[in-house]
Structure formats: structure tokens, C-alpha cells
Amino acid sequence: LGDVYKRQVLSRLIPIGGNRFDEAIINKIKKDKSFVIGEKTAEEIKMTIGSAYVTDESIDVCGRNLVTGLPSEITIESKDVHSALSELFQSIVDAVKIILERTPPEISSDIYKSGVYLTGGSSRIKDLGRFVYDQLGLKVNLCEEPESTVVMGLGAIIEDLSLIHIS
């Protein structure tokens, strides 16, 4: 998470990428359902019924039943996925709050007017923007190609390392 001010980037590492969401889903299903799924299945669950708020959606997925040891199919509900991801959603909000608290007052009004941007593939998770808005009261912008914005931002920083101020 970063904030550009006077050609300096204020940043805070948020180690919450798509893989962390997928791992949380895998672990929750294994613990609660005694059922093992792979990373691709977890990604499918996340992008199909993953949401910052509980919905009435569900998805049938294949994996291995840990009780029988056999391949099987199970229905995963939105509440299961939300339970797995809610702590990560809150961690994102907490990290945004920290960087906003460190933002110079000169640009706080710009942030208030323009909002914050969610980037990265996981920003596509349903209602994540609404969750951040509900928690912070700030406009939330979602990028058209969130995966690309992360790469472009890192590229800009690599080209000019003086932009970085890490705390």
C-alpha cells in the first residue's frame, strides 16, 4: 500500500495477496469440512462466491474427503468463504488506516475527495470495495486491470528507488 507525496512513496507492506486468500479458503475447508481442495479450486471459489459480505451463493467443488480418503464433491457456501476471508479483509482496512494516518495533511483533502484505490487481482473479490468504504467512509476506486497496476507501480519504483520511504 503506498501514497505518493512530493515524489516520495509512503508505504506499508500488506502481505495479503491472492495466494493468502486461497490458502485461507483451503485451510478453512480442510478444518471445517474435513475436505482437501487444491489451489486452482480455491481460486475458483474465491472468484465465484468470495465476497466481503455473506451472500446466498454456493458452489460445488471436487477434492478429497479426508474421512474416506476418496475423491468427492462438496458444496461450499458463501458463509464458509466469508468466514475464511474476513480476517484478511479487516487486515487490508487496518493497513489502509495506518497509511492514511501517516499521510501529510496537505493531501488528506485530495484523498477525501478522490478516494483510495484497490489494486491487485484480489481487489476483484465481490464487495471488497464496499467493505472498505463501509469501514473507512472514503470513496473506493477499483481499477479496470488491477493486476497490471501492481506491476506498473513496482516498475516505476524500480526505475527510481528514491521514491521509497519504508517504515
Tell me the role of every PLM-derived stretch.
Residues 7-9, 109-114, 136-139:
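Short, surface-exposed connector motifs at secondary-structure boundaries
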